[in-house]
Amino acid sequence: MTEPSSPLVIEELPSDLRRPILVAAFAGWNDAAESATSAARFLCQRWSARRIAQILPEEFFHFGLTRPEVRIQEGTQTRKIRWPANEFFLSQETSLPRHAIVLAGIEPHLKWQTFCGHILEVARRAQVSTVITLGALLADVPHTRPVRITGVSTDRQLAERLRTTPTRYEGPTGIVGVLNDACRRGGLDVVSLWANVPHYVSEVSNPHAILALVRRVLDYLEWNTDLGELEAGATEFDRQLARILAQKPEVARYIEELERRGAKAEAAEGESPGDLPGSAQLIREVEQFLREHRRESGQN
């Protein structure tokens, strides 16, 4: 379906899709605690999604920075190279009111506008009219509060429907920001959902952030499913942090200060309230504790 020389490889694309949406998430700068890509993977799994297209990496990646990986195929001694992947998956869940295409990828190093052009080509061929991009950022927020979802949208009603807090951020952007702009210029409705992740637990998976993003997408689709797996992960995450607070009163005081700051008022967009005394050391202790606990329990 695509030219042999094109990095966009469309393997199959049914012509009878029901008002499809595109959900996109990228590992890297846009993906604090891997929250966005974990949400995308969860949706793919829950919808039994199958791959329908991919963007080959050769033109867009510096392999000295993001290296391919060697994997041994199960049950054999055959080694296989796994390249950085940007893949499109089509939902096969028949109870969904409309089809969903999920792009699970990695932020490329090169030719971002060309890269986004290939994404829009898939959207055009599939007759997608709405794009939801997922991201996650580190913020001065406590884990004891509901996850705040910030974002931007080309459609005010769409933003209100997804309950996003508007952002007036200005500054460096990632592939998500570039894709949002490309969609806008291409005439597609786009909303970008960003989970605010507590910066003191940035190096471990955050089930609360994953759950918040998944719920927003499912709410948009008006589709219910059992989220017990994610909810159980969030409960265990809280339990682990409660152990830290019980053992380390200085960490508890740090989080209480974050709670007080949040209770007074949200910090002005783009401003940081600044580091609390000794915060860097506390962050290292929290993350070390969580990593050790997950190794002991066999969690990823």
Regions found by a protein language model. Name each.
Residues 26-30, 103-112, 162-170, 200-204:
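Flexible, glycine/proline-enriched loop segments at strand-loop-helix junctions
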Residues 98, 104-157, 179:
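Internal, conserved structured core segments that host functional sites
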